[in-house]
């Protein structure tokens, strides 16, 4: 289930939304739907999710030498949490 959530997005805009509206931004697998994203975050981080907003950014063309291609597709999910709850980014696996 952890492989469905790729990584958190930390920019100035998401940092402001984090403290202002309790909104966390993550890049998730492209195949997930909003109810699936909500269920993943509620079970993985043990929080109550109020809403899930998603969008798929446009593909970016990359070029290395003569070879051209595209960056991998992903879905960006904006998660709004219940009052007084937070997500700890530093989940560690003790393997």
UniProtKB/Swiss-Prot annotation:
Gene Ontology CC annotation, any one: chloroplast
Statement: the UniProt record of this protein carries the keyword Ribonucleoprotein: yes
Protein's cellular compartments: Plastid, Chloroplast
Alphabetical UniProt keywords: Chloroplast, Plastid, Ribonucleoprotein, Ribosomal protein, RNA-binding, rRNA-binding
Endpoints of the signal sequence: none
Highest taxon of source: Eukaryota
GO molecular function: rRNA binding; structural constituent of ribosome
Family annotation (InterPro entries): Nucleotide-bd_a/b_plait_sf (IPR012677), Ribosomal_uL23-like (IPR013025), Ribosomal_uL23/eL15/eS24_sf (IPR012678)
GO biological process: translation
Main location: plastid
Pfam families (UniProt xref): Ribosomal_L23
Complex and partners: Part of the 50S ribosomal subunit.
Family: Belongs to the universal ribosomal protein uL23 family.
Function: Binds to 23S rRNA.
Record's protein name: Large ribosomal subunit protein uL23c
Organism: Chlamydomonas reinhardtii
């Amino acid at each position: 289930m952890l492989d469905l959530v790729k990584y958190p997005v930390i920019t100035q805009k998401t940092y402001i939304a984090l403290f202002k509206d309790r909104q966390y931004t993550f890049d998730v697998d492209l195949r997930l739907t909003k109810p699936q994203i909500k269920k993943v975050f509620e079970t993985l981080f043990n929080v109550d999710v109020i809403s899930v907003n998603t969008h798929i950014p446009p593909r970016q063309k990359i070029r290395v030498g003569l070879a051209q291609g595209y960056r991998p597709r992903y879905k960006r999910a904006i998660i709004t949490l219940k009052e007084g709850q937070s997500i700890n980014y530093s989940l560690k696996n003790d393997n």
